[in-house]
Amino acid sequence: MIVRIFNIVALFLAGAFYALALPHDLKNGDLVFRDGDEVISEIIKQVDKSGFSHVGMLWISDYGVQVIHSTPSEHSNIKDGVTVDSLEFFISRAKPNSVRFYQVKGSEEARNIAVQTALERVGEKFSIYPGQGVYCTELVAAAWLRAGVSISTGSRKLDMPFISDNPLIFPENLINSENIFPYPQ
């Protein structure tokens, strides 16, 4: 019975993934946005008008398309923080029809630096508080900035009780950058 349920769930997830048409020319360092299923996603969407709550950086590796991102724990055996997941797993945590790919205007050298910078942070804690870890948009913005490409239009405070009163980078701060543009759907 458990095997049957697992197979049904696996088929559903595989179907959901392959229903999404992947851009044929994805590159290292490109960004993938989603509206996630985490509690923090709902909080972010209260103030961000992009329709997204989470972002990761693509890494085209020997193992396929991977996503480097910082997130509250999505795996039962891995702590919150910067991790590398398969694109399939990243998409499986998205709400239906909420995944979009964006290309960053950057040279191949800049792309490699951005990816390497993000990879160097794998294992770092997830946090929206300065000096205590890194959150998703901060991770990708800092990696690209180290590569010489600014992809953030700024930051702002969340203005919610019990949440950091420090300015945060939101998904719309990235999407509105002149150095980021969407792949055609």
Language model segments and positions:
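Hydrophobic h-region of N-terminal signal peptides that target proteins for export
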Residues: 10-21
